[in-house]
Amino acid sequence: MGWMKLYQPQAVDVSSLRGRLNLTQEQFAARFGFSVATLRHWERGDRSPSGASLVLLNVIDRNPAAVLQALQ
């Protein structure tokens, strides 16, 4: 059996992403299912998104409309 390549999502600048979408922290958190507190920690650099959250942020970064449509 061969080795599988492990997907490593890229780091996302959450504050910049939110700014490009022209959303407040509260709006971004509500639309994409994050808590405002978690979003604030990411933006301050206290914590870094990981796992499924990081994957979701990468998808939002590439195609926010598709994520919003899927979440409706």
Task: Write out the residue ranges for each language-model feature.
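DNA major-groove recognition helix of helix-turn-helix/homeodomain DNA-binding modules
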Residues: 52-71
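Short glycine/proline-centered loop/turn elements that form peptide/ligand docking sites
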Residues: 14, 33, 38
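N-terminal flexible/basic segments that precede or flank functional cores
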Residues: 1-11, 66-72
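Conserved hydrophobic/aromatic packing and binding residues within compact polymer-binding modules
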Residues: 28-29, 39-42
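N-terminal positioning helix adjacent to the helix-turn-helix/winged-helix DNA-binding module
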Residues: 10-13, 52
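Residue-level detection of the helix-turn-helix DNA-binding "recognition helix"
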Residues: 19, 33, 44
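Short basic helix-loop element that most often maps to the first helix and adjoining turn
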Residues: 14-27
